[in-house]
Amino acid sequence: MALLQIAEPGQSAAPHQHKRAVGIDLGTTNSLVAAVRSGHADTLCDEQGRDLLPSVVHYQVDAIRVGFDAKREASLDPHNTIVSAKRMMGKALADIDTRQQPYEFVAADNGMPQLQTRQGLVNPVQVSAEILKKLAERGAAALGGELDGVVITVPAYFDDAQRQGTKDAARLAGLHVLRLLNEPTAAAIAYGLDSGQEGVIAVYDLGGGTFDISILRLHRGVFEVMATGGDSALGGDDFDHLLADWIKAQAGLEGQLDASTQRELLDVAAAVKHGLTDADLVPCAFAGWQGEVSRHLFEELITPLVKRTLLACRRALRDAGLEQVEVLEVVMVGGSTRVPLVRERVGEFFQRTPLTSIDPDKVVAIGAAIQADILVGNKPDAEMLLLDVIPLSLGLETMGGLAEKVIPRNTTIPVARAQEFTTFKDGQTAMAIHVVQGERELVADCRSLARFTLTGIPPMAAGAAHIRVTFQVDADGLLSVSAMEKSSGVQAEIQVKPSYGLGEEDILTMLSASIANAQQDMDARMLAEQQVEADRVVESLNAALAADGDALLSTAERAAIDSAITHVLSVRAAGTTNQIKDAIEAADAVSGEFAARRMDASIRKVLTGQNVNKV
């Protein structure tokens, strides 16, 4: 699929002009920047030859340090040294586990977490922007000029708020974002397209703070994400914490450590973990205690976490409708996949040796660089189509508190879907649009994303207006919703930016609940639909009685209809679905003759004074 070259008038790039673009892997623990140079994609190093940049920012009174310089301050000045900001991206303060974190948290008016530093309050978006600036500077220096665009990778399960936060950070850093790219998809680009493979690929991505599993199908240059899963709060940092707790116990320390000591302990644990990648026994010393840590002990500590990742793999395969044997290749991504136990268990689960030929720390950045090179226009003849998916269905609330799905779960993006809705009452001039996310049938069981109101609808009979509601999810997974009344053209639109993110555990809980309550939800939906129909019938009959009851009905006939209305209202409040349906049918039967008389009266009124020959 050749990409169209589009530019502002007078700014068209010459065909031979090579644009500067980089791919950025904005990680929880470390970040990287990569670029395609002379047709080869590779990571870019700093002046000391290091390609990894610790995702750490240290705030001084008159300066901001990023990377290795900041990391050295983590144990000396933990209150002003922000690590793992990615874990907080797009979340409300109430959703962040602040225990064992050395920061002073303050909630902003919108619930966003803010951290008190020497330079005042900063939020995760601002912290991430500093990291992106540093990486962009490295990219510009390596490529010889200002960058024309960047592709930034995010975990597959980042929701709207987390993705928007990432884009905001890039904008704050002065970067032009070509696209946000799912990390597993980036890894598949680096492996799959370079080697020309086709088939089903599993991408196992275990980084410092997040875990993602993606099942992708690659066919004739088309990547389709068949299913995704993972845990946005599980990674190598958690391995460090488990080992740190063990070391702390061996050192005879109890209670909560001060921030500086806790940071020093985590650094010791991380060093031991790295040593155990190649050795069976690693010496360890902390707080006066000296000893050794064996690989066997470390593996015992982390086995429950590794099992959690494999359960997510099993769920993703089930969602894709596949068995392990149907997976042709398993791509390992993230520094934590260097742990021998992880590689061993993943190999056993998928029944094949995982691919590790590309450095697991670099593979995502390399894939992002390849994609950036294409999107910026350096490879206009490149053929590549990436089809990511949305993790939960998107829809809106209809009468009776029902959730009407507009875009089902696992739909590939970008996507736009539209449905038509109508008014419920005569003369209705406005409609409230409530956007929801989830798999349940009732709005009360789904997650509310946004609300807006379409006003200026021309007054007309109930059901006569045609309101077209369009849901659009762009290539970055960001949602916009618009509503338009077709006869008048009045419209309203909203960009959905939730105030906080949705964690992987929340998503799994929502999916599990939808399965466990499927029959109950459907029963509740059918009941709500009948209740809405009962309301419509009662309102319609009352309006008809008010207009023509005295003129067209006898006292007995009116009493019968009034009795039917009372019965519908009574059953609607406490009856079953079938009882409400029977009451509505009974009311229709009793009022049928009245409806016919009203129709005759309307026809006579229209024909009054008309020449028969003209009718």
UniProtKB/Swiss-Prot annotation:
Entry keyword ATP-binding: yes
GO annotation terms (biological process): iron-sulfur cluster assembly
A Pfam entry, by short name: HSP70
One GO MF term attached to the UniProt entry: ATP hydrolysis activity
InterPro entries: ATPase_NBD, Heat_shock_70_CS, HscA_NBD, HSP70_C_sf, HSP70_peptide-bd_sf, Hsp_70_fam, ISC_FeS_clus_asmbl_HscA
Assigned keywords, A-Z: ATP-binding, Chaperone, Nucleotide-binding
NCBIfam families: HscA, PRK05183.1
Function: Chaperone involved in the maturation of iron-sulfur cluster-containing proteins. Has a low intrinsic ATPase activity which is markedly stimulated by HscB.
Family under the similarity heading: Belongs to the heat shock protein 70 family.
Name by which UniProt lists this protein: Chaperone protein HscA homolog
Organism of origin: Aeromonas salmonicida (strain A449)
Gene this protein is translated from: hscA
